[in-house]
Regions:
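Conserved catalytic core of sirtuin-type NAD+-dependent deacylases
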Residues: 2-371
Length: 371
């Protein structure tokens, strides 16, 4: 549809709904007068501790992103940890992330190397899961992306996050590049089961840690960077030798002696194991079917929108690189530098949760009124 045809179509829709030509022109003038100040119309909210410091987006930045989205017919959105930091889920690489304290996540090699490593992983996951599963909710970034998808502006959505907050917000056909903490896989037989069911089994086998999990679930969320601070923790969590610091994948630090005695069940399907969260650990490989699906999305996209990601992992970066090599424009919305910056035709360094709702409004205005 040409620009002229689109404008005529929007005007005919307005007339059909009872808006007179004079009223239509008056509405356009009113919106034009409001446009420079429009961004403040989106309700503000308290910024979580896990989100980096960042100024709100300007009207020009919002319009540029809205134009980028509106011009695309097959927009591929790739999201990362920066989307979920505004849901109080910390990341690894930001100044406030887990790496800032020297924390090292469990690698695939460590997980497979020894039974005691797997016990430690599952003990930490057990204690932290209740808070992660019950208190973590989608934020306005997730909601805006889901709305953009429903309204036909997002062709494919690939996320590097393992929290399933896109699903909770209503996004469909989400490709989880690095898997999800909400499922458990048996490395012997391949059976996939629910993480919630696993939690119930772990509770039955380890009743002595239930109180610690409950205490941590009710404790104020703290950053990994606050570990050495004297800020208050839940007395119950401290007494249980459990750190109240939130970790990126929903786990928590516990005393090594308690982890050593933690009981992990065998696979309910084959009786063997080991059981592992269906997550691509550091040092692991993305499953071939996921690689194929992601590659097809990159090849079919006419534009790529990176949101809340530094795309530092090659599994995500190659999708952007290959699409850009075929001529697809790239927009980046994230607070900080990214590996894709040299490829970007548009870069906006803002928080996704404070920017995308405004972009959604701008896209809707553009669809209805042509600007």
């Amino acid at each position: 549809m040409t620009v002229v045809a689109s404008a005529l179509h929007r005007r005919s829709m307005a007339l059909a709904s009872g808006v007179t030509p004079a009223g239509w022109r008056q509405h356009r003038r009113r919106l034009e007068q409001m446009a420079p100040h429009r961004e403040s119309a989106v309700p503000s909210r308290r910024r979580p501790l896990t989100a980096p410091d960042c100024d709100p987006p300007t009207a020009e930045e919002v319009r540029a992103l809205a134009d980028f989205i509106s011009r695309s017919e097959r927009l591929l959105v790739i999201t990362g940890a920066g989307v979920s930091t505004e849901s109080s889920v910390p990341d690894y690489r930001s100044p406030r992330g887990s790496y800032s304290t020297g924390f090292k996540p469990m690698t695939h090699q460590d997980f497979m190397r020894a039974d005691e490593n797997r016990r430690r992983y599952w003990a930490r996951s057990f204690v932290g899961w209740k808070r992660f599963a019950e208190r973590t909710r989608p934020n306005p970034a997730h909601d805006a992306l889901a709305a953009l998808q429903r309204e036909g502006h997002v062709w494919r959505l690939i996320t590097q996050n393992v929290d399933r907050l896109h699903h909770a917000a209503g996004s469909e056909n989400v490709l989880e590049l690095h898997g999800t903490t909400h499922e458990v896989i048996c490395l012997a037989c391949g059976d996939v089961s629910s993480r919630r069911r696993m939690q119930k089994t772990l509770e039955r086998l380890n009743p002595g840690l239930i109180d610690a999990a409950e205490a941590l679930a009710s404790a104020p969320i703290r950053l990994p960077a606050d570990e050495s601070d004297d800020s208050d923790e839940s007395d119950d969590a401290t007494a249980s030798n459990v750190s109240a610091a939130q970790r990126p994948d929903g786990d928590a630090e516990i005393d090594a002696r308690r982890a050593a005695s933690f009981e992990v069940p065998p696979c309910a399907s084959c009786g063997g194991g080991p059981l592992k969260p269906k997550v691509v650990f550091f040092g692991d490989s993305v499953p071939a079917p996921v690689v194929a699906d992601a590659t097809a999305a990159s090849e079919g996209a006419d534009a790529v929108f990176v949101v809340g990601s530094s795309v530092s992992t090659f599994s995500a970066f190659r999708l952007v690189r290959d699409a850009a090599a075929r001529g697809a424009p790239v927009a980046v919305l994230t607070a900080g530098e990214t590996r894709a910056d040299p490829l970007a035709t548009l870069k906006v360094e803002r928080l996704a949760g404070e920017t995308l709702p405004r972009v959604l409004e701008a896209v809707r205005r553009e669809q209805m009124w042509g600007y």
